[in-house]
Amino acid sequence: MSHPKPLHALAAAALAAAVALGPAHLAAAATPGQPAQGLPTSEQLAAALLTVDDVGPGFAQAPATASPSAGPSAMPSPVNGCDALSDLINMHTGVPGPETPRAEVELDGQGGNPMVTESLTAEDAGKLTADLDAAAAALKSCHTITFNAGTNDSVTFTVTPVTLGDRQDAPAVRLDGTLAGVQLNAFVGVERFGTVGMAFGFFQRDGASSQLASFQYRAAVAKVQRALGTTAGSTTPPTATAPVTRGTSV
């Protein structure tokens, strides 16, 4: 059996789940509206994302069209095995409209091992709270979940709550499974920065250490804090926001 193609597809499916749990994709089901004022812009969010310079040598940025959240074809088959998490992922895999400031990135190591995804979304504080609460509840409810990458291969992962980096209050889980004897491991976490939500995913094969995942998570958190002028876990809006447009008096 040739492993790289199905392994990469399964990795993409698993990390698509991480992005789909982010508030950008939960917001995709919301009623369309105008871009919110007083929130960071998509450009400001993009500047806060990890780059190849942040994660270390050997990584390359995946083309935007190959992003795990680029559309339904990027996640060709639903996940199953945990109703709350599966329903949340399968219901919210669409790309949100322009009224939702967002940015995301996929960084691949050699041969797609490891893979890192990060998405940032800005939205109203109350809506963000509801979206992150839903994602956290879904993560906590799972013990196993199965990913099918659209090939003949599927993997059932055990799901274990973990702490990523130094953020003990941030919801995160570890996923462990095997495919044809190859060990697969992933970490998925969500984080809040005032009115910005982050979804983080890390996938590796033939390895189970959490050290690199935590290192990349710390790097992601630190960069968002620096770029947006905010603190992880805070409900205070970032200092980096779009200018408020004032109407003309008549």
Specify the residue positions occupied by each region the protein language model found.
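Sec-exported extracytoplasmic/periplasmic mature domains
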Residues: 50, 60, 124-127, 137-140, ...
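Second-shell loop/turn segments in exported
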Residues: 39-41, 115-123, 203-210
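Secretory targeting and sorting signals
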Residues: 1-30
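A short, solvent-exposed beta-edge/loop patch
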Residues: 155-219, 223
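N-terminal "mature-domain start" segment
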Residues: 29-102, 232-250
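Long, compositionally biased interface segments
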Residues: 204-250
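Soluble non-cytosolic domains of exported or imported proteins
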Residues: 39, 49, 129, 207-214
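A small/polar (G/S/T-enriched), proline-flanked helix-loop surface module common
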Residues: 66-179, 239-240
